[in-house]
Amino acid sequence: MNFPGRSVLKEIHRIHEDGFDFIDLTIEPPAAWKADGREVGKLTRDLGLSAVGHTAYYLPIASPWPEMRRLARDLYRHCLDKFAAAGIELVNVHPDQRLPLHSKEQVRARNAEAIEGLAEDAAERGIRLMVENLDRMFATAADLEPLFDRVPDLGFHLDIGHANLRLGLGEPNRTPVLLEAFGDRLAHVHVSDNRGGGDDLHLPLGAGAIDWKEAIRNLKRAGWDGTVTLEVFSREREYLRASRRAWIEWWQEVRA
């Protein structure tokens, strides 16, 4: 994934140099927001990279204020226009967890309504939307199910790191449960390590508490052989490269 504080074109070159065969393109401030979709599409094609789209997790798509919801939808459409210009056909959305004084049922319903509208906007541009599991609300199958019920073509974007956060006493990583519920909708995967608890650390693979061989086994049992983003954040690029090498080694080693 490109770092949104740097030039998108420079980030694409960096990702290509590190041996990756696709880019998880995030369009958000401060720098990535200014990307020219046509330039991005030309560069990725020239380098032989495919791409999926990623959007800011903090867009208030389900805000209690109608004015904020309209603005968030307009901003999301702005992203979709850039993705469409780049030839990207799969884009994620994060449910909005920030609805104080609302019940779980209200939060789920408001997000289902918002994501239905965004999915329509995406479809008009030839793009399929996928929803990412989070770490508070929308961490469980029960939270996510109303979204999929409302939007039949909505894809599932599995974040294995998020599935390891805010677990109950004795509760294992939620990946197997989420795949059992939504494996037939699986469209993309994010991986990064953490130590559980509430901190989404985005550590290199193997630096936290996640059993990555078991995670890969679960993906293979679900029939997954598609795109996987190493969402490892560090100033030192070698941590990302090492995670790539480890993932490839484990993927080749593990059997379903």
What is each model feature region?
Residues 7, 62-156, 210:
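Active-site acidic/histidine proton-transfer and metal-coordination neighborhood
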